[in-house]
């Protein structure tokens, strides 16, 4: 008898449709950006709701996300899930306070992958804010010059003693009044 040779390949392992779906990489999210307008009620609650459409069609978020501003300020934010809703919770109020967010500010969120968002912040005049240099900005001490004649800069309490020249810093940044919200009172500091 002659040895018959066929061109048919032997079938590979048979997998179920459910297994095939699990093996496919997660599709690219269709929604990667959203805008939020800051409301006084949300500042008081110390949480911010992520838009439902972003939650539904955007990337799957881990329990912690990172918010990063254009100057490199980063803050880790804990996610709270309530039913189908997703909220920025723990760490959000610190982020809001560090950037002096108040009623009427709006934020542009751009998802960059790996549970990280780039955040651009606009004030009530629709102008981008001046960002704090980093999240350790509050750990600074005033430095007086040798003659005690006046303020010359800031010295960070956690660095190697480098002094920041305020004249140089002010040339780079235009000084704006900061707004702090205490309960429902708005106080403008010069």
Swiss-Prot record:
SUPFAM superfamilies hit by this protein: DNA-binding pseudobarrel domain
Gene Ontology cellular component annotations, sorted alphabetically: nucleus
GO molecular function terms attached to this record: DNA binding
InterPro entries: B3_DNA-bd, DNA-bd_pseudobarrel_sf, Plant_B3_domain
Coarse class of the protein's main subcellular location: nucleus
Disordered as annotated region, ranges: 1-27
UniProt keyword terms in alphabetical order: DNA-binding, Nucleus, Transcription, Transcription regulation
Top-rank lineage group of the source organism: Eukaryota
DNA-binding region: 33-125
Subcellular location: Nucleus
Name recorded for this polypeptide: B3 domain-containing protein At1g49475
């Amino acid at each position: 008898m002659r040895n018959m040779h066929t061109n048919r390949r032997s079938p590979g392992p048979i997998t179920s449709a459910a297994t095939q779906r699990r093996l496919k990489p997660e599709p690219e999210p269709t929604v990667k950006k959203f805008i939020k307008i800051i409301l006084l009620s949300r500042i008081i609650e110390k949480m911010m709701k992520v838009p439902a459409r972003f939650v539904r069609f955007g990337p799957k978020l881990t329990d912690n996300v990172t918010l990063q501003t254009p100057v490199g300020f980063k803050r880790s934010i804990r996610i709270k899930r309530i039913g189908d809703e997703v909220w920025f919770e723990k760490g959000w109020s610190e982020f809001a306070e560090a950037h002096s967010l108040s009623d009427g500010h709006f934020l542009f969120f751009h998802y960059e992958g790996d549970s990280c968002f780039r955040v651009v912040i606009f004030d009530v005049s629709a102008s981008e804010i001046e960002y704090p240099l980093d999240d350790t900005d509050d750990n600074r001490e005033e430095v007086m010059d040798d003659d005690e004649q006046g303020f010359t800069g800031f010295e960070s309490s956690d660095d190697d003693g480098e002094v920041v020249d305020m004249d140089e810093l002010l040339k780079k940044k235009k000084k704006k009044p900061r707004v702090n919200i205490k309960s429902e009172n708005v106080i403008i500091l010069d």
